[in-house]
Amino acid sequence: MDTEREALQCTAYPEVQSFCQRHGLAFEVVDLRWGIPNTQATDYLTTELCLEELERCQKTSIGPAFVALLGDQYGPCPVPRRIEEKEWEALRAQLTSRPRDLELVTRHFQRDDNTIPPTYVLQPSGSLVVPGPEEATLTSVLRGGAQEAWRLGLISQEQWMCYHRSVIEWEIELGLLSSARGDQGATVFLRDVQDLNKHILDDCSLKMVDRLVDGCLDTNAQSLLSGLKGRILDAQPGALKSHHLSWSRDLVNPKNKAHARYLKQLSEQFVARTNHQVLEQLRELELARQELGWLYQEIRHHLWQSTESTKVFCGHQELLAQLRQQLRQDESRTHTPLVLFGPPGIGKTSLMCKLAQQVPELLGHKTVVVLRLLGTSKLSLDARSLLRSLSFQVCLAYGLPLPPAQVLEAHSRVGHFFHTLLHTVSQRNFESLVLLLDSVDDLDSICHSPRVSWLPLKCPPRVHLILSTCSGQQVLHNLQQTLKDPSTYWEVKALSGSQGQEFIQLLLAAEKRMLSPGQRDVLWASLPECGHPGRLRLAFEEARKWASFTVPVPLATTAEEATHQLCIRLEETHGALLVAHVLGYIVSSRYGLSEAELKDVLSLDDEVLQAVYRDWTPPSKELLRFPPLLWVRLRRDLGHCLVRRPVDGCMLLAIAHRQLSQVIQVRYLSGPERAKRHGVLAEFFSGAWSQGIKKLITLPLVGKPLNLDRKVAPQPLWFSSTVANLRKLTELPFHLLHAGRLEELKQEVLGNMSWISCRGISGGIEVLLDDFDMCAPHMNSPEVDLVREAIQLCGPAVELRGLEKSVLYTELLARLLFFAASHPAMIGQLCQQAQSWFRACPYPMLVPLAGFLQPPGGPLRATLTGCHKGITAIAWSLEEKLLVVGTQDGAMVVWDVEEQQVVHVLMGHTAEVKCVRVFAQGTLAISASKDHTLRLWSLLSGQEKVTILDGGSQNPTEPQSWDLHVDERNNVVYSTSGARINMWNLETSKLVFCITGDVSDPWVCVALLAAQGLLLALSKGGQVSLWSSAMGKLQEKHQLSSIKEETPTCAVSIQSRARLVAGFSSGSIALVSAGEDRLLEKLPEAVGFLVVSEDDSLLVAGFGRFVRIFLADSQGFHRFMASDLEHEDMVETAVLGPENNLIITGSRDALIQVWSLSEQGTLLNVLEGVGAPVSLLVRGGTLVVSASRKSSSFKVWDLKSTKKLQSPTPFLDRTGLAAVSHHGSFVYFPKVGDKNKVTIWDLAEGEEQDCLDTSNEVRCLEVAEQAKLLFTGLVSGIVLVFPLNSRQDVLCIPPPEARKAVNCMSLSKSENRLAIAYDNIVLVLDISPGDPCPAIEGPTYTFYTQLPETIVSVAVLADYRVVYGMSDGSLFLYDCACSKVFPLEAHGSRVSCVEVSHSEQLAVSGAEDALLCLWDLQACRGMFEMSYENSCCRGVRCACFSRDDKHVFAGMEDRSVTAWSTVDGTLLAVQFVHAVINRIIPTSNGFMAPTSHGYLIRERFQCPSVRASQQDPLKNFKKAVWLVKTRQREELAAAEASQDAEPVAVEGKESKSNKRSQVCLIL
């Protein structure tokens, strides 16, 4: 059946493989007789291995496990390899009468007394004299003896069958006839050649039937074959697939059309049958699928591994007893985790597994035991996956809510959740929890970080954490740096000599083996007093192969020597080259290789194939593969040296023992060999030689190059639209890197958008970043660094919408387009790939045409989110590089900012944390909370050292100030809360003194003047008090003399001058000291905060939207700059740079502004906070953390960060008034620090081109693109018009009434009408062509709204109709020509924008209630209400129509852009742009919009005429709801019914000609 097998291999197997891959399944064909000579194919060992492989297939395959090709040959009957003693005696008794036959049998078999019971073992034929022709064959002799013994009842029928069954019948019996699955996993393809019996003697049929040695037909074999076919037909008719062929002399000739047709039908039927079986099993699995099936599979895997590890357990009883006692002692107290350590192979794993089995008996049957043998499965390979699976299992075990999706999206949050979960479990005070994590040194990340950030340094009561690791490794050192208590560490020592011998005996007994006394002597002599279980197991692996007649050789005395000895034995048996390459590939792989992958890789290795086919030629002229039998033989001899681990949906083989891996590295992967192994693996996982691509090779017996198909698995990125090739994604970058193929790595992986999106979507952003982190240090490529940072910046958008292609492509394209031209090799190619994907995308999509999102290379270091409420306090531990965060829910979280990981979750406070101070060289922190406790923490151990009940008012509504002052020299802390000052001794936790003030006049601030030994306090009523800081004795009390009738709002101490600077409710700043006070400055508004520099040379005062800087002098402080620093919203906080050359300020509008003090307050940068008011800015070195009370996230900024690659400088508009001209070449906005001027920003150059003086504050801006005019509406009510081609000329439009500020303006689509809106007045003017600039005439019409509310948005049409929206949500259409108003249905809140379509048939209005309304202006009625709500932020900021009026684009309050259909109101696309946009301008194919980040969005909107699935791009959009309501109502009645709201027309059309006098020309 060779032609059939080759046909299936060439055509059927690849098709089934692709089918399985599309369903997320691996497909492996096991045909051990392919590629080897017939003498090996019929070898007794081959038969045994075939049956073993069949059993393995039945255990692992969910679909077909067995396929038989049955023709007209029954095949040879193999001789049993082993015959048990009782059966041997029965056979021998039947042969006593035939001495020659008996002598033949005894010559081939030798007794082995080392088996239990003893057996007779067939000896290899090469060691025997070949029997003469007169002797009966061994097979026939044994058959005769078995026949007689069975007849006499001495052996069973099953034993009799062992001598009469051929290989094919053995396999069909095991694979089909005796299988519990029946025909569900098995198929027999039967080839029936008609009229064959008529041609049985023809030469051409010699190979088609069984024949005897003399060439005669073997009738016995043919009879057995007929019986086998009958059994199959009777027992499993559904599994039998018959193919009837007519006889012909060239039946097996490939050129025979009938035969070719048969082969085609066979292949098609094989594919159909196999695919059907796979689908049937998939349906059953789907019905039985559990929601958390992945978790249950993980748990089962580790339990099975545990059972295997403890099958033979010996020794360590004393250590187990000590561990049990320690667990009992720790049960009711806070304690450190336990760490078991010892050299590799000492028995740590079996000890951990044994302890896991004994824990329930020790701590109670309700104890929850969670065991992980790390590194043995995909979910235990890295800390991120490990914590995820542990959290799920613990939550399930205790009936707690499962981790939410937001937690699982970031490793830092999973770590925080895990820490919190342990405390939650402890507080239940019921069931104990024991976590056992074996081999933490096998975690991917733990070796590379000096701090094990995910590890809880203290376990709460009833929670136990036990780890094991190897001694002498970097991991143990890292653990010792994290867990510093010596009692944490328990050494696992070697067994005693007697225990070592007992261990060997137990291993032999488990295998039903024993040793002869002489062999035992040799074994013990080789292992004098050896108690190392790993070494003992290696010795056992050698000794268990000894038969009683084997003369043993001395074994190696050390584990390393024994490992080398094992390799030598394997090389002698299987060939040095094959062993070196097989083991080299397994060790070189990232996590291991599946058997199918290994066989494919060996089929690509020319050196291996040339060695294999040295003595015979391959069976096929079309394809070349590695003979799988050679691998199975080697795998069998490797035995326990290999371990199977489930990874990426496959069962991978890896080296079980670290010692063996190290020896393989030294022995087989030194020098260039390592790069060669990685190179072949890279070729395989890249798919370079798959899908019919042939590879040249020269085989020894051929002598000429052969170009043959290696038939290896294809390696696409996606097997189907939902199934990614995880194995390729995991392995390829690793092998390209270590093969030194860095350019290929850059082009095909790190610089390939298809790769990036596939890796990100299938594994998540953090897995994608891990790949970049692995490769970047070896590449020295700024481009790679930029792409990595760009991916990291995608985080917020991914959390909002989920990681799907459109999000990732948009995010990266909009960030990397800045660098596409300057770096075309990698970034340019990435951008082109993204653009090509967008062009082919069948869904409505917003496509970036230029960079507009924050580019990589900027100051943002990280955005971190914890599992807690808003952040209320932050402190740095610079020495330990830690950040301590206090939160509203009382949690204290310690972050390693560099690793971006949670180090500790400090649980103790039950209410909001108000204040945190770090001291003792960054090792201790003390916190104050609304729960009126002080808690002292060790930042190294995470342990709470002291709890102090600090007292204070229990009235939650009473306004109080909290503060802490640590005096390290005296080891005391001063806590202030309301009207109480307490001094506590940190060593004894004793109260030293308590100062109680007037409850009705609490202290606003208290300063510790350490140098003077004073406490200085300022009360709400302005009373100054001084006490001795040592004894708390009152020394002075007086009322402020310089400030009257003002309340203190904030204060800061000036330690170098022993003074206090206080801010007051009416803007006063006073300098307060012992015995005196004086007014320092009077600010226009209440002082919100005060900040002083580290050297006391600068003072910062925040008031309203402004910040003022003061410089220290001999008298106190004087103003540093003439102008104040200005925000657009209330300034909340500020911090000074490390050298006083920068100041960073934060405001309620979530913006952070960076100013240069060395350049007199020049604004350097505007940064986006966390989307909530910036309430905290804290600096540590050059890093600044920004946080908010309303967000659980915080951002880390690097002040010294310089741009890695130059990108355009953003324009610094903070007003949201930016206007755009010249098709996006120039941007106009009020000048920073001087709103009486308008900055003209050149986007191409990234610099200010000019500045226009308006003499008054600018309130709004509009650009007439065609007319080239800039309209500036001022707070004075004047509108200045600047011709853009001659900016020295200015037109002035005066206001209708004095001191009325311009609220908004609008131009008609044809730019021939201008509407200017004030609070309740609208002017409509005409714009007509003129020379040198257009003429502005009018106002042609003026009307009043007659409403108390103000106009906030306006739009004008060419026919003098005006649509305007009010502050209360009202919306009106006013026809100036006929002086009529048409009320449109009101919004529920302030109207934020009104826009008219280009045809002026439609209008769209947006409001702060997130509602967009589409209006038919001809019928004056609503068409659609389109609502879009985000759970965090609601509202519409701006909108516009596309040029063809088919779509509406809207800028939303949640920093996203939406696209809607005007035909049916459908939401077509949503794009998160990270920034607020206040204006959208339509372009020919999309829109452009200036952002609050200072970039101009340019996007193309592509909307296929037939939308494939209009909601598909929105399927993952989280936390948002959109709704469309169709409006069906009659046209509105005439406006008489609402005359009270009708505007009053002041000027009519006829007055148009005499209005020019109101416009003056300024030269």
Curated annotation (Swiss-Prot):
GO CC terms in record: cytosol; nucleolus
One BP term from GO: positive regulation of gene expression
Keywords associated with the record: ATP-binding, Cytoplasm, Nucleotide-binding, Repeat, WD repeat
UniProt region (Disordered), positions on chain: 1534-1563
UniProt entry tagged with the keyword Cell membrane: no
Single annotated GO MF: ATP binding
Pfam family, one: HTH_NWD1
WD repeats: 274-314, 866-905, 908-947, 954-994, 998-1037, 1044-1082, 1126-1165, 1168-1207, 1212-1251, 1253-1292, 1346-1385, 1386-1425, 1431-1470
Residues of the NACHT domain: 336-666
Location within or outside the cell: Cytoplasm, Cytosol
Domain of life: Eukaryota
Record field: transmembrane: none
Binding positions for ATP per the UniProt entry: 342-349
Function: May play a role in the control of androgen receptor (AR) protein steady-state levels.
Assembly description: May interact with HSP90AA1, HSP90AB1 and BAG2.
Name of the featured protein: NACHT domain- and WD repeat-containing protein 1
Species for this entry: Mus musculus
Gene: Nwd1
